[in-house]
From Swiss-Prot:
S-S bonds: none
Positions bound to a fatty acid: R127, H128, Y129
Species: Gallus gallus (Chicken)
CC annotations in GO: cytosol; nucleus
Example GO molecular function: fatty acid binding
Post-translational modification N-acetylvaline, affected residues: V2
GO biological process, one term: fatty acid transport
Protein name per UniProt: Fatty acid-binding protein, brain
Entry keyword set: Acetylation, Cytoplasm, Lipid-binding, Transport
UniProt keyword Ligase, yes or no: no
Summary of the function given for this chain in its UniProt record: FABPs are thought to play a role in the intracellular transport of long-chain fatty acids and their acyl-CoA esters.
Domain of life: Eukaryota
CDD domains for the chain: FABP7
Length: 132
């Protein structure tokens, strides 16, 4: 089912992302960059691993993981997390844990777009991606 996500995705629109970054403790300057950056996300399946590459004018990141197995992740805002990604029906669920905190991203395909819902506490942001 992860194959449905395997594509190159370009950010089309974003809602409440600044509030989400603020809740995470991201500083003002980095939030300003985060708000104007339109990343390209490339999701691929390589053997038993899933690879998510995020490319932008600000920073490029790459994570490689097996579904359901914890891995170490350094986020674009330099948090060191223990992360796990699972498939829950038709949703790709990504949980990051650090310093006693937890955030999650749920990616799903709706009408040919990838919808990413980011949740930290009671703050929710939604980002829509279109195939590039």
């Amino acid at each position: 089912m992860v194959e449905a996500f395997c594509a190159t995705w370009k950010l089309a629109d974003s809602h409440n992302f600044d509030e989400y970054m603020k809740a995470l403790g991201v500083g003002f300057a980095m939030r300003q960059v985060g708000n104007v950056t339109k990343p390209t996300v490339i999701i691929s399946s390589e053997g038993d691993k899933v690879v998510i590459r995020t490319q932008s004018t600000f920073k490029n990141t790459e994570i490689s993981f097996k579904l359901g197995e914890e891995f170490d992740e350094t986020t674009p805002d330099d948090r060191n997390c223990k992360s796990v990604v699972t498939l829950d029906g038709d949703k790709l669920v990504h949980v990051q844990k650090w310093d006693g905190k937890e955030t999650n991203f749920v990616r799903e395909i709706k009408d040919g777009r990838m919808v990413m819902t980011l949740t930290f506490g009671d703050v929710v942001a939604v980002r829509h991606y279109e195939k590039a």
